[in-house]
Structures are given as C-alpha cells and as structure tokens.
C-alpha cells in the first residue's frame, strides 16, 4: 500500500471532525447546574458520551443517525446526573401516584417547573448562539469535561467545586456530636470521609443496631399504677416545617414535660416510619430489613400487651392508600381493631380524595371510651394525616395552605390535653411525627418531594406529656439534646411502664431521662441514604458513591 495514500485517507477521515454543535449547550447547561450543586454529576459517563458525539463519521447518514441515537442517551444521562428519584423508586411508587387526584397531580407538575431555571436556560441559549459565531465552543467544552474527570480521580467531582458546602444540613436545630452513653458506643467516625469509609461506618452502624433491645420487665409489681399510653403519630411535621410557618413556639410544645430536640425519624415515608415506631424496642433497621421478620421483643405494643396493656388503634383516615393499614398489621404487628370513625365529621379531603376525620372529635371519642372502660391499662396508636401535602378543604379543588392546617391541629391537641387534665385519668401522651412535609425544598429535591430523607425532613419534634401526676412537672420542658430515635422512646416507656411516676410525691426527671439510648443520624428510603459523619451530612443514591449533601 502506498504510504501517501494512507496519509491522505487518514486526513480525509479527520476532515469529518464536526465538533459538538448544539450538544455544547447540553454540556454547558450541566456545567452551570453542577457549579450551583444542582447535579450529582458523573464525570466519566459524560466524557464517554462526549467522545461518542465527537467521533468522526464520514457518512452523513450515519452521522445523522448518531444524533438520533444520542437524544435518548443524553436524556437518560441527564436524568442520571440529577438528584431526581431513581427509576426503581418511581416504579415502586407508581401505584401510589395512580391514587392521587387529578388536581393534585396537576399541582405537582406545576410545582416541578422552575421558571427561574427556564429563564436561565433561555439566556444560556442566546449567549451560546451569540458566542458560537466567533468562538469554537467545543474546545472549551471538551477542556472543561476533561478537567472534571482529572479532579474526579481524587473523589466525586461535585465535592471539589467551589459552590459545595459541607455545613450541617440541620441548621440551628441540627444536633452537635455527642458522647454516647457508657455501654452504648457508636461506630467511630474518625477516618476521612471517603466513600469506602462511609460505607464501612454505615455497615458498622447497622451491625451494632442489631444487638440493641429494650429490656421490659417480665411482670409488673403489685403496686404498679394503671395508666393509658397514647402515641400520636403525625404525618408531615418537622422542625423545618414549623419554622417555615412560624409555629415552633405554639403553646402545645411548651406544655410538654419532655422534648427531644434531636430526634431522627430515620425515613421520609409514612409506612416505614410507622413500622419503625411500632418496632421501637429494637435498634434501627435498614430499609430492606423493615420488611423482614424480626424477633417479637422488637414490637413496642406487643411488649406492653404482655404486661396487661390493651392495644388500641385509631386513624383519621381509611389506611387504604399505600397499603398503610396492611403494613401496620403485617410489619408492625398492630392487630387491634380499628376504632370506629362513624359519625365523625371531616373538614379536609386527602390528596387521594378520601375524607380526613376531625382529630379532636376522634380523641374525644377515645377519651369517652377510656372513661367507660374504667382504670385498665391501654396502649393506643393514633396515626393522623391532616398536614399531608395535597390535602384540601371540603368543597375546594385547591390544596390547603400548611399553616392554617398546622395551627388547627396544634390547637386541637392543646385543647385535648386540657380535656385530659380535667378528666382525672393517668395518661402518657407521646407526640411523634412520621417525617416532615418538606415545605422548603433544597438543591436536591423540590418542595413536597420526600424521595431523599434529608435532615430537614427527618429532624422531627417529639414531645411527651404525663397527665394525672401527683407531682406534675413544673416549668419549661426537659430537653433531650443528644441524637435520638425510636429506641429512646421505647426505653423511656419501659421506665414508665409500672406507672409509679404518677403516684410519687416528687419525680427526679433528670434520672428518668438519663442515659437514654443515642442513635447516630442515619436516614434511609428505598434508594437513598443520608448520614451524618463528622458533623456533616453525606448522601448515597442507588448504591452509588457517597457525596456531601449539597447546601
């Protein structure tokens, strides 16, 4: 073969180097989003995609087909680079989406559109068209992506960009790192926050949690005092939500005897949250293990039933959506019959079109039933959803504002506590939200979206009020500032289970709450894990690498 003809052939091939053309805009948009932490950018797949677009192809027809093929690939890669829910998550939630009302779906679509970003994209388009007249933009695009791949060798590219902040995501309410109680040592977090070390820390955490359990007494003493335990499980309430609507100082919270300031709900969805609460007597499980059999001693209400407490169940909704009631039965072992909702009024309609019953009326009915039942021991689980996103007032097609709904709920609970005080019954009221409402979105997910269990969603206000005491608590609530979760609630209930605290002439509240189990802040949904490590939040999506949670 003639060497000259080979050289001419090679030169002819490289004459078909056409540049990125309009795909420059695709990558420039990604760079802009990455700079402001709106992407979970995967540098190498993007470099491979760029190489595919740049590869010289002599045939005009094949070149055209390459662009047709690149469109779905580019869309899929862009989606993969976002913080949006994974395909598995969307498929798993698909049946629930089908249950949403048409008005709520339209509202979610409208909320999803960020008009500021649409405007910024338009400006970027005009700027690109203007500059591309004189500048070969492909050169700068390739250089930028190659640079991102080079710096990514040392770790995720997103963590090396100037816009990234690793400040704690809980703001003023995020608990500081605390020294664990003796015999309750948490896994060490002294190693550098590499992806491997973070995964090892998570595995150590779950291994440790498997061995933690609340020790309830086998029997109650002869002088034990009967009382009612009422657990009020509120959907969509976090500290961040209360601050967003200025209700963090509502009188309800000042009535509490004990407040957990650093409680972690460990999940952002209702079913898993309720299961975790009903299984509070054992350490924190992974999301996968929530749906696996566990030892019977893990079930809080079963432990109480063995000591003579009658289990009771109340809902202010049907429990049909998302198979919520079914999960309570199967994974939470809550077998008590559902208290009747007949004759209870409703002012709210849920996001799926079903009625939400008046909570004060339900609680008043519960109190009447306890009074008629005498002084026996009862343990009641009450799940309520008036604060859920998409709920609307009866007769309206528009979602009701969160603030008036929260105000009314807090007022109703406040009124009910007054009713309990007047009733003369001995009652332990535990207010423990499932998760937050995500009223304020962040760079990872829009307002109302809870696919990622961010600190603002899982940092929930938990309060305990003891009613009917001979020596009631005086002054402001006792604050538990250490990182806590459901095991601490179970332990506290076990300390109160004999009811003697109601008849004592004085109560040492510090001793009552001393040494409660501490739990590191780790939250998990089906495809996302958010974890505090060395005082900073990190996130892992779909089993990938850990990256700092964008602020």
What is each model feature region?
Residues 158-393, 486, 491-510:
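Active-site-proximal alpha/beta segments of enzymes that process anionic O-linked groups
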């Amino acid at each position: 073969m003639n060497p000259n003809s080979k050289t001419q052939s090679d030169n002819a091939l490289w004459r078909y180097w056409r540049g990125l053309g309009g795909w420059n805009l695709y990558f420039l948009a990604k760079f802009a989003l990455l700079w402001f932490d709106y992407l979970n950018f995967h540098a190498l797949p993007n470099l491979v995609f760029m190489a595919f677009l740049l590869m010289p192809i002599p045939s005009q027809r094949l070149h055209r087909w390459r662009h047709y093929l690149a469109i779905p690939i580019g869309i899929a890669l862009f989606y993969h680079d976002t913080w949006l829910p994974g395909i598995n998550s969307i498929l798993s939630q698909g049946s629930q989406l089908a249950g949403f009302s048409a008005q709520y779906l339209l509202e979610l679509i409208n909320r999803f559109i960020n008009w500021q970003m649409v405007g910024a994209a338009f400006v970027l388009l005009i700027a690109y068209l203007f500059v591309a007249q004189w500048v070969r933009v492909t050169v700068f695009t390739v250089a930028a992506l190659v640079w991102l791949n080079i710096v990514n060798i040392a770790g995720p590219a997103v963590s090396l960009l100037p816009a990234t902040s690793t400040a704690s995501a809980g703001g003023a309410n995020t608990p500081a790192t605390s020294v664990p109680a003796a015999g309750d040592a948490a896994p060490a977090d002294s190693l550098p926050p590499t992806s491997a070390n973070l995964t090892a820390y998570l595995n150590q955490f779950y291994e440790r949690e498997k061995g933690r359990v609340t020790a309830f007494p086998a029997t109650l003493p002869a002088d034990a005092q009967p009382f009612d335990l009422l657990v009020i499980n509120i959907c969509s309430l976090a500290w961040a939500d209360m601050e967003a609507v200025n209700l963090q100082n509502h009188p309800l919270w000042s009535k509490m005897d004990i407040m957990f300031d650093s409680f972690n709900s460990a999940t952002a969805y209702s079913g898993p949250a309720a299961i975790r609460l009903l299984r509070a007597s054992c350490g924190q499980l992974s999301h996968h293990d929530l749906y696996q059999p566990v030892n019977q001693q893990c079930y809080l209400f079963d432990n109480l039933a063995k000591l003579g407490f009658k289990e009771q169940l109340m809902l202010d909704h049907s429990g049909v959506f998302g198979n919520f009631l079914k999960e309570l039965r199967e994974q939470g072992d809550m077998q008590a019959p559902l208290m009747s909702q007949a004759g209870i009024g409703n002012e709210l309609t849920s996001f799926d079109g079903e009625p939400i019953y008046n909570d004060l009326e339900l609680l008043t009915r519960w109190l009447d039933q306890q009074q008629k039942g005498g002084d026996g021991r009862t343990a009641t689980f009450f799940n309520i959803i008036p604060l859920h996103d998409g709920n609307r007032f009866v007769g309206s097609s528009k979602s009701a504002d969160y603030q008036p709904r929260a105000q009314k709920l807090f007022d109703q609970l406040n009124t009910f506590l007054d009713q309990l005080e007047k009733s003369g019954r001995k009652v332990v009221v535990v207010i423990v939200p499932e998760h937050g409402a995500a009223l304020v979105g962040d760079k990872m997910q829009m307002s109302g979206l809870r696919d990622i269990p961010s600190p603002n969603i899982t940092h929930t206000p938990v309060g305990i009020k003891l009613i009917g005491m001979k020596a009631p608590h005086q002054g402001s609530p006792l604050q538990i500032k250490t990182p806590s979760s459901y095991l601490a609630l179970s332990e506290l209930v076990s300390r109160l289970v004999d009811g003697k605290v109601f008849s004592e002439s004085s109560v040492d509240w510090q001793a009552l709450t001393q040494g409660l189990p501490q739990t590191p802040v780790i939250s998990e949904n089906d495809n996302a894990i958010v974890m505090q490590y060395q005082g900073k939040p990190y996130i892992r999506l779909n089993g990938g690498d850990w990256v700092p949670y964008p602020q």
